[in-house]
Amino acid sequence: GERPRRFVTDVVRDHGARPDGSADAAPAINRAIAAAGERGGGTVTIPAGTYRIDDIIRIGHSDVVLRGAGSGATTLYATRSLTELIGVYGSRYGGDKSSWSWAGGLIWLCPKERWASLTEAIRAREWPFEGWTGNRRDDWRTLATPAPARRGDRTITVPGADARRLRRGRLVLLRLADDPGHTLLQHMAGDGEGARAYAWADKTKLTSYAPYEWPVRITGARGRRITLERPLPLDLRPEWDPRLTTLVTPLTGCGVEGLTLEAVEKPQAPHLLDQGYNGVAFQCAYDCWADDVTVRHVDNGFGLIGASACTLRRTKVEGRGSHHPYYCREGSHDNLIEDFAVVARTTPAPPGTQLHGINVEGLSSYNVWSRGRMEMGTFDSHRGMPFGCVRTDITVNNNGVHGGDGSAGPLFGARFTHWNIRVVNGRAGLMRIDGLAPYSATVGISEVREFGQIDVPDFTGDLHTRLEAYGSPETVRPANLYEAQRGVRLR
């Protein structure tokens, strides 16, 4: 028989939004999104025009797509910050920092219940954890205890009694806890001599990021053998108490397409004191996306917060300058950011501000940035030891700085790759990483020299790195590592 028609609702025709900016359109847009969610999914269309929004646009049900008429045609004009709309958001690590400097969005994709518990905690000034296991990281239960396995395995073995709970299509969380000797962190850093000698114990922010939590969908279950959608990111060793667990109800199959989010233009705030004029945030989201989306005059552009298997395609950050044009944190894994742009700022940077760039931190792993144009910013490995990430086919004016305090640990874990990177201002910092990142590859990078922010390696001894085609990115084949790897996988 015929497939049922997907539910479609229009914010102007069906919900009374005005496309001339004369009235607050947020209630109409959120009503339309809720209507789609209540029907099990659907598409919310926003015709060409400018829509004033005085509230957050929230996508909290799976399989809902918010679709404008194109980033050059549909504009959402945001008038208020997250501080005004939700409240002050302090840091769970203390001090007077504003967590809106790295969290939340004026378009916010997050499961309805998770968003409610998160914002309730913020209003109560409890400064929550932000990921897949709730505000205190205790919202989970064990489904299975897998047998030892190796990084890269797609099939794992679980006890027979556990296997009955692991049906095909179920989304589960792989949980790996560190041990007193911090051998899990050593493994993330490549298990080299430098990782074994590193002083992990006093890196209290880094150690707070463990356990490592990796969401994955089950694609096959036959007896005790469970097949996963993606290869294991790390070994499964008994000393790390590996478990497959439940997780908060995820947001899946949601997208934002064909629009510009423009915040009211206010001067950029001093570093770490952002009010939260933020762009699009994906939180506890799996297999969600943005396509043809521009954000303008924002504090922070596109955020991945405990998000996995999401794709940002044809996205752009422009306007008066931002703190994090793109950020990827709180254990975000397996995401793709491609055909992206960070456009040069339209006003000079105020004193006391910082520009990062394409950020990754907080034990986030296996993320890819591909086909980018960065007229400002840097490759912001923000400590917190991200690992296994690829940056490829990017042109960058390397004028940003990385962040991250010392208690967050190393800049890089193992297996970073920078491939075909064209550095127009010749600055080495965070571009050429053969002297910094263990088990890394720097392939086809422009000739660069050290100036500005200069880093020293976190790990002693041989880093086991590769430097190839230095000074001649135009000769590198394939020109785009991600596309080549994807082609091999699909064959």
Task: Describe each region flagged by the PLM.
Residues 24-28, 49, 58, 210, ...:
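Short, glycine/acidic-rich beta->alpha junctions
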